[in-house]
UniProtKB/Swiss-Prot annotation:
Intervals of motif DEAH box: 278-281
Cross-referenced Pfam families: Helicase_C (PF00271), RapA_C (PF12137), SNF2-rel_dom (PF00176), Tudor_1_RapA (PF18339), Tudor_RapA (PF18337)
InterPro entries cross-referenced by the UniProt entry: Helicase_ATP-bd (IPR014001), Helicase_C-like (IPR001650), Helicase_RapA (IPR023949), P-loop_NTPase (IPR027417), RapA_C (IPR022737), SNF2-like_sf (IPR038718), SNF2/RAD54-like_C (IPR049730), SNF2_N (IPR000330)
Coiled-coil ranges per UniProt: none
Function as written in the Swiss-Prot or TrEMBL entry: Transcription regulator that activates transcription by stimulating RNA polymerase (RNAP) recycling in case of stress conditions such as supercoiled DNA or high salt concentrations. Probably acts by releasing the RNAP, when it is trapped or immobilized on tightly supercoiled DNA. Does not activate transcription on linear DNA. Probably not involved in DNA repair.
PANTHER family recorded: DNA ANNEALING HELICASE AND ENDONUCLEASE ZRANB3 FAMILY MEMBER, SWI_SNF-RELATED MATRIX-ASSOCIATED ACTIN-DEPENDENT REGULATOR OF CHROMATIN SUBFAMILY A-LIKE PROTEIN 1
Protein's name according to its UniProt entry: RNA polymerase-associated protein RapA
Signal peptide positions (record): none
Entry's family note: Belongs to the SNF2/RAD54 helicase family. RapA subfamily.
GO BP annotations, alphabetical order: regulation of DNA-templated transcription
Keyword Transcription regulation attached: yes
Length: 968
């Protein structure tokens, strides 16, 4: 290489050193100073990994003093290049010796990197292009936010999330029956709002006991890292900010924390985008005296744009309480309870018409009259004729029914603010079978109970009942905590025999206390060597994950998982169908929560519920109340909370004192009240609301599209290649899973989201659903998103040189492949990506400037190419420079035409969609007051903003591949 003092070179292996200057040439060695870092490097002149930096006419270069020069020509003197051109500040004709170039120059533009000899590997160019294609596919999908969560593809859940999640600042009541997945629906909406940029700051308010459950659900299912705030956390946060809520974007806290005026004031001042309130049916309200809890949520809902309330079914706690929750969502709309009741009465005609349309028979005259009256502003006679006619194609008739149903949904009821699914309207649940196993009370327990009775005269009824339900706890109080009650308790003997006779079955065992769960594991292990694992609140999230994974393993896994009451919250084990209740909780909601660990959509088998109990004890009496009074073992009991509230005192009396007459009276009264409530709920079912809530065929279509995406082998291949390029170690673990670990040769110093000790992942949804310790990889997963950002946000793959071995073409034939991106910088919240997603534009030029991209697709072209080393590639680029420069200008012309067309189409699509949606909402607002003015205002502003962003869109060259034909 011809070196001269003062020449500027760049290191091929350490480009971060910046522009170097030759400071010594002696014998066979050359020394280069890199002023940006102050470092010297000595190289062999013959094999120096250096590339000469020479700019060309038309380039802009910067001097060490900071001014720029537009190069018009260059000359050389004593091996030093002198640039001639116009001074950027004075406009004068000046010269600039290369020695005086700014040494901080970085070659960020692909063409600068190409001419500077910074040529990347061929496979990295391919991965970069695939990454840009994946980003385009994700951003342009109308299902953005629904694919990534580790949840089953349940139609009604996906429908609600799809409908609500894409709204601006949704204000909605989620009121599905227990077991239908309100938490998942809320999580899907949160995930969608975050991914689409509609929300950035989210506050979730939950009961104290559910904070950990929500934290786990958000992390494990939705890859969302929330922070739990309590008083201690708020005090700690003062070091970072006066308002602790500003220290995190995603926060979970209890209502108890916000009862304090100081904390509530801080929360009100924290600029949240979305408020989520779980167990909202516990917010008590009357017009004269709303509770403090209600006032807290009301104050927050007045300043936070989006609100999701998760609640029991509306009829579960009465209409006034239902109205109170709707009032939180829209106080202008739901301002008066009596007016609300009158309006609800008018819905009956709508429900009758909806029920008739939902069927498959001809419409009765009463339904036709109702429809004509309800949809008076629209001529519905053509649709009615189609539905009533004989010999019409079934699909045509169904389309007519669906159209009229949609008109009803749009115009009447609380369909936009309330979603309620019931088990009656959602199919796919297993049957539940109850099996009870009576056992005699051991002498040891009887003695402990007698002693306790003599000593505990001042205990409350509730304390006495709890004591009677857990005799093993009472026994330990009098012996000591290490007393081995499990050695004589007949329920333990039964459990061991049950597990031995069901060796091939997975069995979930739930007990009230963590200590009981630990003792049971010890008993199974020491007495029979049965493989079991425990799951309780004293364990960390990771420990629970490992226990759950051990239980889920088909081969070599635990036969039984023993959970405590609190420890099992939020965890589901649909792969098991046998549930052993070692004891009973006092609250019907907790009993349903236990059964709900198995009784969920996605459970493939009927559920067998097993209860070993001690005869003639509180355990038997509570079992009778649940089974005979509420039928709570074999059916869900939506009225359980109300019934417990009404009969709690009588029930506690019966549990604390054995009185058969009192028990009989309690059972009779409970049965009677249960039937009343059940009948009232059946009468209150709103067919139109149910149709709107489960989505019907539209929901199924969404699920089918998501399932097709799950099976996308192209995505799997692209992600695997992405990890290969970055340097992530991948170990096949079997069972559809891979272990990812950082390697010693990572391309980037850090890979956010990839732990040092690795993570187990799968591309298979069923595998991820059965294993809490395995992450589900989709294109929405943070590990994929981060990988895409690492590649596309760096210079990786921006330049490449390849050889095309094809004897049909003359040797030396040159092709230039250019990848452009339409750059329309806009905040994610603008939703610009819906109309103009980041789209790679490929141009393939021959040496004459003809674009061949339409004739030669990327994949077939790429397969024919071979890599060349960096040194040879640099020489080929240098030799081809006279041809390349005019080709870049030509390529930009072609790409600009494409971008202009894309922008025009995006503008047309945006105007058409938003205008149609605005017109629809404006016309509906006249007949349905549930259309909020804020939504209309948002659409008007959005159109103006998007037009501004589209006007400012620019073309950006993202990557270059130079290809030369060779016959060697």
């Amino acid at each position: 290489m011809p070196f001269a003092l003062g020449q500027r070179w760049i290191s091929d292996t350490e480009s971060e050193l910046g522009l170097g200057t030759v400071v010594q040439v002696e014998g066979r060695m050359v020394t280069v100073l890199f002023p940006a870092t102050g470092e010297n490097r000595m190289f062999s002149r013959a094999e120096a990994p250096l590339t000469r930096v020479i700019y060309n006419p038309g380039d802009s270069v910067e001097s060490h003093e900071g001014w720029s020069l537009a190069v018009s020509e260059l000359t050389e003197k004593d091996g030093i290049v002198i640039y001639h051109g116009i001074h950027s500040e004075t406009g004068e004709q000046v010269t600039l010796r290369e020695t005086l170039l700014n040494h901080n120059i970085r070659f960020n533009k692909p063409q600068d990197r190409l001419f500077a000899g910074q040529i990347d590997r061929l496979d990295r160019f391919g991965v970069r292009y695939q990454c840009q294609m994946l980003r385009h596919k994700l951003a342009s999908s109308d299902l953005l936010g629904l694919q990534g969560p580790r949840v089953g593809l349940i139609p009604h859940q996906m429908w609600i999330a799809h409908e609500v999640g894409r709204r601006y600042a949704p204000r909605v009541l989620l009121a599905d029956e227990v077991g239908l997945g309100k938490t998942i629906e809320a999580g899907l909406i949160i995930h969608q709002q975050l991914l689409t940029g509609r929300a950035e700051r989210i506050l979730i308010i939950v009961p104290d006991t559910l904070r950990h459950q929500w934290l786990v659900e958000m992390l494990r299912r939705f890859n969302l890292r929330f922070s739990v705030f309590d008083e201690d956390r708020c005090v700690e946060a003062y070091a970072d900010h006066d308002n602790p809520f500003y220290t995190e974007q995603l926060v979970i806290c209890s209502l108890e924390l916000l009862r304090k005026k100081k904390r509530l004031d801080q929360a009100l001042d924290a600029d949240w985008d979305l408020l989520v309130v779980d167990e909202a049916h516990h917010l008590e309200w009357t017009e004269e005296a709303p509770s403090r809890a209600y006032q807290v949520v009301e104050a927050l809902s007045e300043v936070i744009p989006g609100v999701l309330l998760l609640t029991a079914t509306p009829d579960q706690l009465g209409h006034e309480s239902h109205f109170a929750r709707l009032r939180l969502l829209d106080p202008d709309r739901f301002y008066d309870y009596d007016a609300f009741l009158a309006e609800e009465d008018s819905y009956k005609d709508v429900a009758i018409a909806a029920e008739a349309l939902a069927g498959n028979t001809k419409l009765p005259d009463a339904a036709i009259n109702s429809l004509t009256e309800l949809l008076g502003e629209k001529d519905i006679s053509p649709s009615i004729r189609l539905i009533q006619a004989d010999g019409i194609d079934a699909e045509v008739q169904q389309a007519a029914r669906s159209e009229l149903l949609q008109e009803l949904l749009d115009r009447h009821g609380t369909g936009r603010v309330l979603y309620r699914n019931s088990r009656a309207s959602v199919k796919g649940f297993p049957k539940r079978f109850f099996n009870a196993y009576p056992h005699a009370m051991p002498d040891q327990y009887q003695t402990a109970a007698r002693v306790s009775g003599m000593m505990g005269g001042h205990k409350s009824l509730e304390a006495k009942a709890a004591q009677a339900l857990s005799p093993e706890k009472l026994y330990q109080e009098f012996e000591d905590n290490s007393a081995s009650w499990w050695k004589f308790d007949p329920r333990v003997d039964w459990l061991i025999e049950f597990l031995k006779s069901h060796r091939s079955k997975k069995v979930l065992i739930i007990a009230s206390q963590a200590e009981t769960a630990l003792s049971l594991e010890e008993a199974l292990r020491t007495r029979e060597g049965i493989q079991a694992t425990v799951f309780h609140e004293g364990m960390s999230i990771i420990e629970r994950d490992k226990a759950g994974a051990y239980f889920a393993q088909e081969e070599g896994g635990a036969q039984a998982l023993i959970c405590s009451e609190i420890g099992s919250e939020g965890r589901n084990f649909q792969f098991a169908s046998h549930l052993v209740l070692f004891d009973l909780p006092l609250n019907p909601d907790l009993l349903e929560q236990r059964i709900g660990r198995l009784d969920r959509i996605g459970q493939k088998n009927d559920i067998q519920i097993h209860l070993p109990y001690l005869e003639d004890t509180a355990q038997e009496r509570l079992m009778q109340w649940y089974h005979q009074g509420l039928n709570a073992f074999e059916l869900t009991c939506p009225s359980g909370h109300v019934l417990y509230s009404e009969f709690a005192e009588d029930l506690l009396n019966v549990l604390a004192v054995d009185d058969s007459d009192e028990l009989t009276n309690l059972l009779n009264h409970t049965q009677s009240r249960y039937k009343e409530l059940k009948h009232a709920m059946e009468q209150g079912r709103d067919k139109l609301l149910e149709i709107n809530s489960h989505g019907g065929e539209k929901a199924m279509a969404i699920v089918q599209r998501l399932a097709q995406n799950d099976g996308d082998t192209h995505l799997i291949g692209s992600v695997i290649r992405l990890w290969d390029i970055i340097g992530v170690d991948q170990e096949d673990k079997g069972e559809n899973s891979i272990i990812l670990r950082p390697s010693e040769h990572m391309m980037f110093p850090t890979y956010p989201g990839l732990p040092e000790d690795g993570v187990t992942v799968t591309f298979d949804r069923d595998t991820a659903l059965s294993r809490d310790d395995i992450a589900l990889i989709t294109q929405e997963h943070p590990l994929v998103q981060t990988g895409l950002d690492l590649i596309t946000g760096s210079e990786t793959g921006t330049t490449s040189v390849a050889i095309l071995k094809n004897k049909a073409l003359p040797a030396g034939t040159l092709f230039l492949e250019l990848i452009y991106m339409a750059d329309a910088s806009a905040p994610k919240s603008s939703q610009l990506y819906r109309y103009l997603p980041p789209t790679p534009i490929r141009v393939l030029l021959d040496k004459n400037g003809n674009d061949l991209s339409a004739k030669v697709d990327y994949a077939s072209f790429d397969k024919q190419l071979s890599a060349v080393n960096r040194h040879i590639g640099g020489k080929l680029v240098t030799a081809s420079q006279p041809i390349l420069h005019p080709l870049f200008a030509k390529g930009e012309e072609y790409a600009q035409v494409v971008v202009d067309e894309m922008v025009a189409q995006a503008r047309e699509k945006m105007t058409q969609q938003l205008s149609a949606e605005r017109s629809r909402l404006e016309s509906l607002k006249a007949v349905n007051p549930n259309i909020r003015e804020e939504e209309l205002e948002y659409l008007r502003n959005q159109m103006q903003e998007l037009n501004t962003y589209l006007d400012a869109s620019q073309l950006q060259l993202d990557a270059i591949r130079m290809v030369l034909v060779s016959h060697v």
